[in-house]
C-alpha cells in the first residue's frame, strides 16, 4: 500500500505535545476529492471534535474545485471522520478527562482513499515552545560546527 503525502500540519508539533496518533478516513464529496488531487488542502488551524458519538473535522480547508459547477463544495464545511466506535469512545474519554485536543497532523493517500493522521495532543505552554526553539537552534548550530570541522 502506497502513502502519498497531501498536506502536513507543521505548526502542530510546535504548538502541541503529541501523545498518540490515530489514522482516520474522511467522508468527502466528489469535487473535494478532485480539489485534493490538485493539492488544494490545508490543515493549519483545524481540529477534530466529538459530536453525538461521531468525530468531525472542523476548520480544515479544501479549496473550491476550479472546474466545478454550482454544486461545488463549501471550503470550510465540517467533515465526518471515520473511526471504529471503540476508538471514538476512547477518544471521548481522553478529551473529557484529561483535557486533550484532537488535531490533524498529516493528510495522505492510502491507495485511493484520503486518510488523516490525527494526533491526541496537549497544548504547550509558552516556556515549552521557547525550549523547543532553543533546542532546535542548538541542534542546527551543532551540525554547522561539525560540518565546518570536517
Curated annotation (Swiss-Prot):
Alphabetical GO biological process terms: trans-translation
GO MF term set: RNA binding
Alphabetical UniProt keywords: Cytoplasm, RNA-binding
Primary localization class, coarse: cytoplasm
Gene3D superfamilies attached to this UniProt entry: 2.40.280.10
Entry-linked CDD domains: SmpB
GO cellular component, one term: cytosol
Localization terms from the record: Cytoplasm
SUPFAM superfamilies per the UniProt record, alphabetical: Small protein B (SmpB)
Plastid is among the record's keywords: no
Superkingdom in the source lineage: Bacteria
Functional note: Required for rescue of stalled ribosomes mediated by trans-translation. Binds to transfer-messenger RNA (tmRNA), required for stable association of tmRNA with ribosomes. tmRNA and SmpB together mimic tRNA shape, replacing the anticodon stem-loop with SmpB. tmRNA is encoded by the ssrA gene; the 2 termini fold to resemble tRNA(Ala) and it encodes a 'tag peptide', a short internal open reading frame. During trans-translation Ala-aminoacylated tmRNA acts like a tRNA, entering the A-site of stalled ribosomes, displacing the stalled mRNA.
Family per similarity comment: Belongs to the SmpB family.
Protein name, as recorded: SsrA-binding protein
Lineage, highest ranks first: Bacteria, Pseudomonadati, Pseudomonadota, Alphaproteobacteria, Magnetococcales
The encoding gene: smpB
